[in-house]
Amino acid sequence: MNYRIEISLLPDPNQMLMYTGFRNRITAAALFSTILFVFLFQGSAMGAGQEKKRATATRTSGQVNIDGRLEEPSWQEAVPATDFVIYNPHNGIPSSYRTEVRILYDDDALYIGAIMFDSKPDSIYTELGQRDEGDINADHFWVEISPFNDGLNGEVFKVSASNVQIDNKMTTSESWERHDTWDAVWDSRTTVNDNGWVAELKIPYSALRFPRSATQLWGINFWREVRRIRETSSWNFVTKEFGSSIAHLGELTGMRDVKPPLRLSLVPYVSGYLEHVTDEPGVGTSYNGGLDLKVGLTESFTLDATLIPDFGQVQSDDQVLNLSPYEVKYNEKRPFFMEGTELFNKGDIFYSRRIGGTPHLVRAVYDMTGENEVVTRNPSEVSLLNATKISGRTSGGLGIGIFNAVTNSTWAEVENTVTGEKRRIMTEPLTNYNMLVLDQTLKNDSYVSVMNTSVIRAGEDSEDFYTANVSAFEALVKTSDRLWSASAGGALSQKYYTSAPTALGHFMTFNAGKTGGKFRTDYNFMLMSDTYDPNDMGYLRRNNEISHSVDFGYNTYEPFGNIMSTRTSVDISYDQLYMPRAFTSASIELDGMLILMNYWSFSLNLGFTPWGEDDYFEPRTRDMSMYYHRPPAFEARLRGDTDKSKRLYLEFNGEYMKAWSDYGQHGYSWSLQPEFKASRRFSFDYEIAVEKMFNDIGFVEADPVEGITFGKRNVTTVTNTLSGAFIFSSDSYLTLRGRHYWSKADYDGSYYTLQADGSLSDRTSDVDNSDVNSNFLNIDMVYTWRFAPGSELSLVWKNSIWSEGDVIIRSGLDNFADLLSMPQTNSISLKILYYLDYQNFRKVFRSK
């Protein structure tokens, strides 16, 4: 029905004949979707009869020492969970190695004791690594826990044989992807003995959220990885054919009269910085202090707040030269905005880098100066005053998330060079960011969610400073066997101005198909209006789009010959511009991947756009009145990697592109990344990535007297990245990362004027030099010492150099020498944070 509504809203009735074909396609798509829904909810009984195992927790009244030995009598009284089943490589057969897991509990914590039997204990891998580094060369044991047993949300506590801790959140919506930015405070110890190795875990109830009930019934599963033979097994069987691991949890029984504790913790910090810029005198100093607060409002809901935060030690961004019409999206690296944000990722309308990001008018300031005025100060970042999160889930499965943050007003300073008069220009007002999420779990790992974001800027509204709001929903429904699913979503964006009409935009999406089993297929529909804009608090690369796609895939999960598993798929898509309604592209993509029994993997992707693409975004016109017709093109991508458990690991990527046009557009890219484990303490990896585009056609800023200008250029990008880590212990490590990015766009002097039919004609007037030679060099060296649970000392050295000019430097050595002659920023910082937990204080006072 939504499809017909969109058709009826076409702005020009005279164009209806033009859209008849499109309308028929929409009707056919709706019919196809209806038929698919019939099959979807009839379902199949395959895989639905999997019986859950049950493990029993035993209450202990004695003290449990976390030493990795399991010598307390209580451990012998607990009933072991055994009979693990292989996940990789032979899914579904008994594990080659015996494993026993016992569970104890008391009023404060859950205790897990696991014995991993191994006839070759001297061959157990024990590489050291940083906390949350889950892919180190070591044997692993982990437990997945879902206190609400909803099949949708849970926590993972993982430990290596070398006692490196990894913890993360897991959800069914991300399949096997997990949020490894979550850091809980828990304890573990491991030992290696003549029979194998032992892991002992203590998980305080303060690290979990669970319902207030006399009898607890939790979802649980245990996993083991034997690294040297790459065998992974689980206690409760997990099939590869559908769903994520959280959909295959067993059950934990026996826990009675356990009360959710008062969860209250403080993490105060102090930090200091020394900074020097080579072409400026003196050394700058600064000192900061603040705290993070965590409060359990109820047994299921937690408030997280950060007051006067300091994110100066986060890893430097991988900056790039951007020749496209789209904004570059950088990953979030600030801990507060990465931890406990699973609910806020719903609907894809929250991009936390907007908070404390670049001021709206940071570039416009230079156009706001008067005669004889120069900009003397123009901050590139907005100051964050505070941020708060409230999140949790009720016993009925309703998840609630509330986020709020306040950023300070930001001012640029301008000075008159003749009179000396100074004035300030506001580049960003005091701003409040808010998000509300409601997420209801349903049967069969299904859910429905509604979300809302709002950005309220203080002061007088204008074209730049306005109030923005986005309301959205999404829903996922699965059949009882989890083989078929359907999802739908939509959003409405609103911008409120004082002196202009409210700007409204909308977005909708629909997907249905067979998403489990060996053969898979689905249909996707997406519609985004030309006015849909969630970017005040979210990130959207581009709007104004309608897309249809159908995907067919076939996967194998059982080994045959030397092949462990395969994945193949065909994707056919058809895309249009929403306004004005017009064809943009059609493509077909073939994808194949295989994993060998020696854990080498290879993938091949082939893409075709047989009719080319009408690109309405490259001309940079707001009204989409012009487009550039990109010629038919072909792309081939190849990837391969070796067994990561070996001392030397290699990853290779290669790509070739060719367009059929008079300009001879073609290009290639490749990357090679060797990783070497010199010892169980020291490892390093190096990556070189090269991309070359020949006779590339792109937009050029020039005098618009002849119209929109395009130019022909060769674009070369070379990126070198070196990373290394020396691990003193599981709580102390030194890391180093250096990255040099060099990109140059070399125009050959051929410039063109864009025509109304998307073609190009030779430009007759001159164009200024458009060449670009851009460099970014960043070095981050970090020493981390986790001196107590949840407490940390970090010492960081950063070096950054940037250069950009219109002179192309041909030689790599000459380019690097020129870069080193530019001003460098060096900083050294020390930060200490200390974890204070109410439960620990309560135990101390209770013992007295």
What are the language-model segments listed below?
Residues 237-259, 410-481, 514, 601-647, ...:
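Outer-membrane beta-barrel transmembrane domain signature of Gram-negative proteins
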Residues 44-55, 840-848:
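Sec-dependent signal peptide cleavage junction
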Residues 383-385, 391, 467-468, 481-848:
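Exposed, low-structure sequence patches enriched in small/polar residues
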Residues 3-32:
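Bacterial N-terminal signal peptides that target proteins for export
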Residues 47-441, 450, 822:
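Structural preference for beta-rich elements and adjacent junctions enriched in aromatics
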Residues 302, 308, 316-317, 331-333, ...:
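Extended, well-ordered alpha-helical scaffold/bundle regions in very large, multi-domain proteins
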Residues 279-281, 292, 324, 378, ...:
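Alpha-helix capping and helix-loop boundary segments enriched in small/acidic/polar residues
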Residues 29-42:
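Bacterial N-terminal signal peptides
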